[in-house]
């Protein structure tokens, strides 16, 4: 018998049967070995056939196992296993049956048919399970769909719909699909296109996360509920699994063969199946090799003739990039555009999904949490779409609450650690026999007993609360199942079952749930089982870094005293500090314009008066780190072409993929302080980019993505008009100086730029008393650096006055002070420390001697 007369699946089964016989020390491969190999084969063609004939496959497999155990064993056969005469004659019978059926190849099911015809032990066993030649022959016809086996891969391609698609209508019947709320217009338009005579193929287009797949799931649910026109009743919606279609297609043409078998089966169904292709663009170019046809071209004839009812789904960008490039494919589809739902629609969607998420996480989701998820995600997450981003917030918040319920509460955990600590101490003291140790041990034993008593009480409360929560969950799960059963009964028209569920089981469960919820409403001391708006805000803050959670008392106090904190580092600039503090307070109190940055300021004034220092202090105040500031040195943007570095290079230029310096920094950290230093040195075209940022709080980068600046503080610094400040400082008040400076500034910057800045702040030149305060701050930093090396620095008033006097320069502000400290304090100190004059741990006193700074112990 030639092996190449068998299909590839059957050949693999024969190899498996040989391995099985060898492993069990059997001398011959018997028909039973091959039958077991066929049943155990991955993607076995025999199993679905037996299931169709109502055979208990597991029981048959165990009976075959018993037959294998009865076969004689021969040790030392050395891998030489041959076909038994029974199997040889069975193969000849298979060949005869295949020829009778006009098959070019012998397939696995022919072996089953031949085994029943055969008079051997395998045939007897199969007949015991109620299998007859007639029954098996009819089942084979049904599975093959009237086709002959003319291809060695015929078995792999058979029942392609079962292998390569997922039945959405079946999943809807089982209640596995989430409910679809709203989207009636889009579903109606999809049904309308499907009802056409030709080109009845809608393609659902929308941004990622707006609910394209949900529309098809909604269609599947409407079909099983008979809420569709007559033409669509009883149809099945199958989702094409592209992964399964491509996976394992090793040889050229194998992918096309699989797709062709799917299309052939769909054609046979005569329009009873609607094929859903998610990510439709993947079909264009799929399977394309040199000189071969891609999947998109294979679909075209079936789509044009109306043989294939297809619903596609893809994003706008991918539709433009792949589908529109192929006009022949594009014209066969009808577009159904899906827009992002409004916040109100999203709230309705979330209310519909609420029960599913409650059941999954075993927590309760409150209505304020749903409203907060929709509104906060809409405001603060700008690069994603509703309802997806709102659902994510609900899901993660519920997950965090569940995690807290499952893990030990913090109070219990702390007590447990304390008990362990006391037990270790008790163990150590029990080995000591002096009076002090015994006294301490007695106190310790008392404390340990008290802690263990507290722990036992708390643990009891925790277990009781957990039990109360799990009780409601079981009732909720039973109620959900009862509602699903009611739907099934309603579709089947089973009125008895419907009345039993609707008027008996469901009201009873609802009553139980109310009672359990009332018991649960007693104040929980350890566990939280409700997702509230506070949890949603917390999750959002973790995701984006934007503080939207309710302020604690400590934070309110901190914001009210913000000026004091800023004044500790920024000396003598009362107006600037007030302006910045007011902007931050407006933002945290929720009063600032949601469509503009938190604040945009132009800091003007001479060099070294604290313009940049105020930005650093603000970043430190908001984020506890100066590094949280996005600093852009505008002197780097003096040429016109350098503007592209801020927002990213346009398409076609080198660096297009990298994104812009400013836009990428803000995308990563939407809540930040942006410092545009020395802004007057930049090219005038840079200010055209800033207009959008200052007015609408948004900027489009080189790749067309909109970057949200609404949660940033934009601060620009400039030295313009500093000469006017120096000239008029003595004779004019603050308002007069500001007018003089703004006169110079308005000549340099365009009116539309200045008009968009919230506040232009003029900084005062620093006086002698300011420099002295700054000297104290700078010496405190030096003291901190020395303390890290175990030296204690002390400075007397005389030395401080001298440093302030040497470092004072009305033109250059506080910067000369830094140099004065370096030259008069740091340099001599460094020499003395290296020479070993001061030892670690010793105090260093700075005083004045002969008009110079002198360091002594």
From Swiss-Prot:
Stored Pfam families: AAA, AAA_2, AAA_lid_9, Clp_N, ClpB_D2-small
SUPFAM superfamilies on file: Double Clp-N motif, P-loop containing nucleoside triphosphate hydrolases
Coiled-coil regions listed in the entry: 391-525
UniProt-annotated stretches for the region Linker: 341-545
GO BP annotation list: cellular response to heat; protein refolding
Domain Clp R per the UniProt entry, residue ranges: 3-146
Region C-terminal: start-end pairs: 766-857
Ligand binding (ATP 1): 206-213
Region (NBD2): 555-765
Compartment(s) of residence: Cytoplasm
Chain positions covered by the region annotation Repeat 1: 6-71
Sequence segments annotated as region (NBD1): 159-340
The UniProt record lists the keyword Hydrolase: no
Complexes and interactors: Homohexamer. The oligomerization is ATP-dependent.
Domain notes: The Clp repeat (R) domain probably functions as a substrate-discriminating domain, recruiting aggregated proteins to the ClpB hexamer and/or stabilizing bound proteins. The NBD2 domain is responsible for oligomerization, whereas the NBD1 domain stabilizes the hexamer probably in an ATP-dependent manner. The movement of the coiled-coil domain is essential for ClpB ability to rescue proteins from an aggregated state, probably by pulling apart large aggregated proteins, which are bound between the coiled-coils motifs of adjacent ClpB subunits in the functional hexamer.
Protein name: Chaperone protein ClpB
Native source organism of the sequence: Vibrio cholerae serotype O1 (strain ATCC 39315 / El Tor Inaba N16961)
Name of the gene this protein is made from: clpB
């Amino acid at each position: 018998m030639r092996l190449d007369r068998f299909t590839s699946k059957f050949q693999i089964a024969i190899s498996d049967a040989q391995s099985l016989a060898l492993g069990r020390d059997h001398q011959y491969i018997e028909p039973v070995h091959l039958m077991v190999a066929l049943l155990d084969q991955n993607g076995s063609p025999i199993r679905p056939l037996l299931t169709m004939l109502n055979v208990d496959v597991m029981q048959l497999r165990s009976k075959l196992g018993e037959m294998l155990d009865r076969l004689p064993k021969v040790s030392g056969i050395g891998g030489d296993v041959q076909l038994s005469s029974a199997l040889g004659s069975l193969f000849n019978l298979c060949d005869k049956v295949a020829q009778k059926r006009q098959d070019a190849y012998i397939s696995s099911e022919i072996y089953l048919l031949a085994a029943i015809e055969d008079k051997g032990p395998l045939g007897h066993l199969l007949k015991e399970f109620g299998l007859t030649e007639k029954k098996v022959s009819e089942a084979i016809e049904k599975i093959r769909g009237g086709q002959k086996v003319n291809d060695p891969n015929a078995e792999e391609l058979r029942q392609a719909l079962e292998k390569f698609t997922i039945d959405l209508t079946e999943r809807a019947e089982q209640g596995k699909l989430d409910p679809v709320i709203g989207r009636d217009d889009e579903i109606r338009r999809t049904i309308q296109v499907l009802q056409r005579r030709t080109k009845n193929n809608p393609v659902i287009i929308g941004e990622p996360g707006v609910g394209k797949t949900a529309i098809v799931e909604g269609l599947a649910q409407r079909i099983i509920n008979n809420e569709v026109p007559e033409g669509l009743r009883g149809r099945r919606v199958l989702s094409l699994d592209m992964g399964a279609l491509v996976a394992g297609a090793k040889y050229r043409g194998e992918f096309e063969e699989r797709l062709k078998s799917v299309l052939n089966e769909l054609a046979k169904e005569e329009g009873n199946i609607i094929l859903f292709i998610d990510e439709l663009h993947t079909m264009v170019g799929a399977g394309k090799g040199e000189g071969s046809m891609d999947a998109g071209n294979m679909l075209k004839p079936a789509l044009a003739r109306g043989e294939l009812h297809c619903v596609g789904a893809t994003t706008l960008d991918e539709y433009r990039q792949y589908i529109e490039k192929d006009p022949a494919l594009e014209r066969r589809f009808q577009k159904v555009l899906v827009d992002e739902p409004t916040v109100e629609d999203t709230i309705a969607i979330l209310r519909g999904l609420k029960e599913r998420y409650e059941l999954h996480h075993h927590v309760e989701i409150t209505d304020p949490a749903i409203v907060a998820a929709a509104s906060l995600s809409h405001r603060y997450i700008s690069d994603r779409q509703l309802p997806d981003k709102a659902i994510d917030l609900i899901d993660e918040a519920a997950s965090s609450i569940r995690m807290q319920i499952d893990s030990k509460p913090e109070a219990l955990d702390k007590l447990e650690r304390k008990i362990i600590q006391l037990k270790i101490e008790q163990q150590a003291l029990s080995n000591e026999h002096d009076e002090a140790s015994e006294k301490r041990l007695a106190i310790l034993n008392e404390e340990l007993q008290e802690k263990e008593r507290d722990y036992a009480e708390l643990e009891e409360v925790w277990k009781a609360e957990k039990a109360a929560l799990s009780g409601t969950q079981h009732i909720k799960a039973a109620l959900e199942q009862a509602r699903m059963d009611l739907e099934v009964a309603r579709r089947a028209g089973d009125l008895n079952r419907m009345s039993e569920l609707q008027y008996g089981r469901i009201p009873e469960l609802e009553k139980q749930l109310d009672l359990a919820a009332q018991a649960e409403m007693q104040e929980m001391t350890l566990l939280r089982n409700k997702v509230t708006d506070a949890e949603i805000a917390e999750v959002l803050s973790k995701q984006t870094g934007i503080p939207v959670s309710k302020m604690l008392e400590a934070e309110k106090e901190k914001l009210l005293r913000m000026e004091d904190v800023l004044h500790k580092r920024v000396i003598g600039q009362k107006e600037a500090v007030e302006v910045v503090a007011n902007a931050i307070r407006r933002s945290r109190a929720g009063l600032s314009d949601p469509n503009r940055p938190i604040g945009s300021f132009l800091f003007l004034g001479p060099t070294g008066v604290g313009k940049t220092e105020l930005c650093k202090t603000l970043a430190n105040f908001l984020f506890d780190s100066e590094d949280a500031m996005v600093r852009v040195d505008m002197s780097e943007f003096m040429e016109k072409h350098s503007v592209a570095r801020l927002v990213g290079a346009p398409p076609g230029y080198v660096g297009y993929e990298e994104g812009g310096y400013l836009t990428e920094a803000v995308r990563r950290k939407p809540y930040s302080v942006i410092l545009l230093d020395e802004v007057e040195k930049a090219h005038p075209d840079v200010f055209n980019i800033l207009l959008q940022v200052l007015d609408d709080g948004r900027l489009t980068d080189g790749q067309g993505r909109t970057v949200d600046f609404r949660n940033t503080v934009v601060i620009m610094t400039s030295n313009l008009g500093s000469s006017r400040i120096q000239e008029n400082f003595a004779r004019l008040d603050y308002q007069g100086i500001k007018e003089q400076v703004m006169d110079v500034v308005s000549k340099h910057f365009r009116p539309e730029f200045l008009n968009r800045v919230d506040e232009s702040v003029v900084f005062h030149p620093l006086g002698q008393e300011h420099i002295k305060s700054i000297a104290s701050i700078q010496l405190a930093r030096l003291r901190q650096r020395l303390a890290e090396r175990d030296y204690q620095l002390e400075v007397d008033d005389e030395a401080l006055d001298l440093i302030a006097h040497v470092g004072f320069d009305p033109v250059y502000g506080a910067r000369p002070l830094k140099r004065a400290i370096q030259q008069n304090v740091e340099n001599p100190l460094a020499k003395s420390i290296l020479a070993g004059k001061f030892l670690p741990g010793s105090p260093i006193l700075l005083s004045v001697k002969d008009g110079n700074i002198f360091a002594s112990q």
